[in-house]
Amino acid sequence: MPTAFSRRSLLAAGLSLGLLAAGSAQAADWCASKPVKFAGVNWESGMLLTELMGFVLQHGYDCKVDSIPGNSITLEQALANDDIQVFAEEWIGRSEAWNKAAAAGKVVGVGAPIEGATEGWYVPRYLVEGEGAKAPNLKTIADLGQYAELFRDPEEPGKGRFYNCPAGWTCELENTQMLQSYGLSDKYTNFRPGTGPALDAAIVSATKRKQPILTYYWSPTPLLGRVDMVQLKPRDGEAKRIQVQAGLSKAFHDGAPELVAVLSRVNVPIELLNRTLAEQAEAKQDAPTTAKALLKAHPELWQAWVTDAAARNKIQAAL
C-alpha cells in the first residue's frame, strides 16, 4: 500500500504524464488536420532555418510541412491571414506589413533563431584601407555624396550605382528611403538586382577585379565570410537594433503550443551558421541537404530544441 509521500509522487507522475500526453495531442491535433506551411523565403539563412524547423516538425511530430514561395511582404501578409503559419527568419520591426499585423494581434514572434545579425551599406576593404586605396576618407554613408564618380553606373555614367536589395524585399524599401534621406537620390541610381544570387554575383565579380562597388548587405550570409567588406557608418542614432525571431500566425501560435515551444527554442550560433552557409555555397548544396547534414553533425542543437523523448528518437532515426 503506497505511503502518503508515494501517493503524492504517483499523483505528480500522473499529472506529468498527462501534461506530456496533452502536449503531444496538441501537436497531433494540428498536424492531423492541416499542414504547417512555411514562408518560402529566398535568402540563404532563411532557407536553411526553414528547412531545419521543417525537418524537426516533420520527422519529430509527424507534421506535413510545406513551403510557399513569395517575396517578404507578400509572405508576411499571408502569415497575418494564417495562409502560412511560420516565417522562420523574421527581422522584427523591419516591415510595415509585420508591424501592422503584430499591432492587430495577427502574428506573434517567438524565440531567437539567430543572434548577432547585422546589416548595412558596404564597400570592399581594399577601396578604403591599405596601400592604393582609392577612398581612404570614405567612412560613413553621409560621405557618399563626394564619391558618386568612384561608383559610376555603366548605364548612367553621370551617377554612381548603389546596389539595393531585390524588389519586394523589405530592405529594398528602407534603402530607397535612406537614399532620399541622405540626399543621394540625384547622385546614385537605385539599382535593384532581380534576386539575392544576382546581388551576390555582382559583388563577387567586382571584388575579384578589385573594382569599386557600393552595396547593401547583411549577416548571416556565406558571402561576408568569403569577401572582405567594410560597413559604412550611419548617422548617430540610426544604427539598428536587430532582433530575429520565428514569426508565427496567431492561429498557429494558439493552436499548437507544443510545436510553438519547439520553434521558440530553435537557435543556431551565428559563427556556425555563417560557416555552414559558406560550406553550402562552396559545395553547391541545396538547403534541405545542408539542413540534414547540420542536424546530423550537431545533435546538441536539435536536442536542445526538442525535449520530448519520442520526438527525439524519431528525428534521430530520420537522420
Residue locations for each model-derived region?
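Pocket-flanking alpha-helical
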Residues: T50, I68-K106, A202, P222-D228
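Short, polar/charged alpha-helical segment
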Residues: E44-C63, Q177-Q180
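A bilobed periplasmic-binding-protein/Venus flytrap-type ligand-binding module shared by bacterial periplasmic
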Residues: G120-G132, I242-A256, E279
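An extracytoplasmic/periplasmic, membrane-proximal ligand-sensing/linker region
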Residues: S45, W169-T189, G194-D200, V204-K208, ...
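A conserved helix-loop-strand patch within extracytoplasmic ligand-binding domains
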Residues: V107-Y163
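Short, well-ordered beta-strand elements
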Residues: W30-S45, C63-I68, K159-Y163, L263
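Immediate post-signal peptide segment of exported/extracytoplasmic ligand-binding proteins
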Residues: A25-F38, F151-K159, Q303-W305, L319
